[in-house]
């Protein structure tokens, strides 16, 4: 595959994944400790509305990063080349992030969104957030692997 096409896939993968990466790292480093200082009502309302917007807009960005990374891995030759291998490592990081999001974070997001939309504070509001918090470092770590591998793959391009 031509170098401009590989560079385009790499740029698209980096830009899209970078949005998700930045969001999760922000929540791991800033939002999580700040939210621990808030009351359940404020936390539920703010996070419920954030998740309502985020869970509508972020899937397109995440899917773009995932597909561009998969395309880069395939177009660069997969395990047979250094660029392809690095792109596959990035893909593994993205898939790990997605799996953890779907299994743990998304159900919490949906519960918080429903609570905020109906203006109710669930009795387990803090437990819900603790569940979400329990995987944010893993998600951010998986995305760090993905971003690092994508950057390294990009440096390998001619």
Where are these regions (language model features)?
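Internal alpha-helical transmembrane segments of multi-pass membrane proteins, especially GPCRs
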Residues: 11, 52, 88, 130-133, ...
């Amino acid at each position: 595959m031509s170098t401009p096409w590989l560079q385009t896939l790499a740029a698209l993968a980096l830009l899209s994944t970078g949005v998700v990466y930045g969001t999760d790292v922000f929540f791991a480093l800033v939002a999580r400790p700040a939210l621990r200082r808030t009351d359940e009502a404020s936390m539920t309302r703010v996070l419920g509305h954030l998740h309502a917007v985020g869970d509508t807009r972020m899937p397109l960005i995440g899917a773009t990063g995932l597909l561009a990374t998969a395309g880069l891995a395939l177009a660069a030759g997969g395990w047979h080349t250094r660029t392809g291998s690095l792109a596959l490592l990035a893909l593994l990081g993205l898939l790990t992030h997605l799996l953890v999001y779907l299994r743990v974070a998304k159900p919490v997001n949906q519960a918080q969104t429903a609570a905020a939309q109906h203006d109710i504070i669930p009795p387990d509001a803090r437990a819900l957030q603790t569940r979400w918090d329990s995987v944010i470092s893993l998600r951010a770590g998986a995305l760090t692997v993905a971003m690092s591998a994508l950057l390294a793959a990009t440096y390998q391009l001619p």
